[in-house]
């Protein structure tokens, strides 16, 4: 049995009860956290890590889960958000309590990472991930890890998985888009393509952050989450890079499914306007690895991990990541 398979086996059998128990365990088990830095040439990239308990010499290895943020918000507001009085919204906390060693990073020009003259397109994001991998391997001992990307972060993750398949064990793509055909969100965004090409940054203010929660199906998220996200993100300013917007409105597809060799979970909220069901079904059908799942979640839109039904999202991801390894025929 491979190391990756044995790690998945440690988590096999966990189901929705375990996920919900993790949600309620906040008071008893506060994850340990640490900060790190990776270097991509002159660019310094901020990494953040959470797990239950500090690392100890000789401990059993834990499965590593790396979370990849999208176009408009940096890593910790995306995946480690606190919403007072509203329950658990930190994806890092949830999966740390499920036994994972959870990592994320700010891409170039986001959050705490270096500011440059670039526009932080998808290719740049994949290069960021490549720069982060030696740090994760050094600190965890893991040569392979699970990766989950959301929205343009899913594109970054898929491109990286295609470029370096030896690094990625299981791959989760949420709020993903393939060709962009049939996407009302991208059609609307394309109207501003000339402006995105003319500047490496765009306005990302409180109103724009709120629109993430309302543009597809209002009511699928608590708007208190939008306010908490804006509070957490706007400390980094009201500008964010345009590169992923240019790519998603003029350069799709940026990855071909045949090039993604890892097992894949493709997960979509039924109201998500970033991609049509037909577009995603086309991508899914062409994935070469037979170990793949396509999950559609009802009463959900683009921001699945911020939604009212986020526990269903946690469950779908955990079920996929903890899948027992297949027995070859």
Q: What are the language-model segments listed below?
A:
Residues 273-279:
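Conserved alpha/beta-hydrolase "acid-adjacent" motif
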Residues 28-57:
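N-terminal cap/lid segment of alpha/beta-hydrolase-fold proteins
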Residues 127-143:
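Conserved acidic catalytic loop of the alpha/beta-hydrolase fold
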Residues 300-310:
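Catalytic histidine-centered segment of alpha/beta-hydrolase-like enzymes
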Residues 56-61, 65-97:
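Short, surface-exposed "cap/lid" segments of acyl-processing enzymes
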Residues 148, 152-179:
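Conserved hydrolase catalytic core segment
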Residues 186-267:
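Alpha/beta-hydrolase
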Residues 1-17:
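N-terminal secretory signal peptides and thylakoid transit peptides that target proteins
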